[in-house]
Amino acid sequence: MLQKLMSVFLTERSTAILQIKYKSNTIQLKTDSVPLAEYHKPVYLLCDQKTFSAGEGFAMILQNRKRAMVIGETTAGAGNISGPYVVNDSFVITIPVGVINDVLTGKGWEGSGVVPDVAVKSNDALAKAIEIIQKKR
């Protein structure tokens, strides 16, 4: 699903954006060859420590490609793929089974999160984004 969303904002078609490394194999997620829609205007993403998983991937991919400005706080840093394993009838654990990295940088967001381009407290992020947009007009 993330690659479908990325296809709206990135102009490259059928291009690898993420690499997922599992114990036995590696796969790449690519942008769609034909996107559902296209959006070419500036993008401003508001993030904080509650932004995690695919939300972080979305922010990192656009940020690394200079396609969006990330405003707010560093994200949660939850980037590994996990899977549930049944221990017994009443106990299930979730453990990491794959690591995700941006193919452009070779780095992921697990443990480190996505660091914003403009760091402000979460409550101030929207006002800061509006200020930045108004200055660019």
Residue ranges and their predicted role:
Residues 58-59, 82-85:
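Histidine/acidic-residue-rich catalytic or RNA/ligand-binding cores of hydrolases
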Residues 1-46, 50, 80-83, 97-103, ...:
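Gly/Ser/Thr-rich loop/hinge elements
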Residues 7-14, 51-52, 63-67, 134-137:
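Sec-exported extracytoplasmic/periplasmic mature domains
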Residues 89-99:
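Acidic, Ser/Thr-rich peripheral helices and adjacent loops at domain boundaries
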Residues 50-53, 66-79:
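Short, well-structured beta-strand/strand-turn elements
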Residues 6-7, 87-91:
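Short, hinge-like loop/turn segments at secondary-structure boundaries
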Residues 107-137:
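Low-complexity, Gly/Ser/Thr/Pro-rich intrinsically disordered linker/tail segments
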Residues 2-7, 40-43, 55-59, 63, ...:
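Extracytoplasmic/secreted envelope proteins and their assembly/folding machinery
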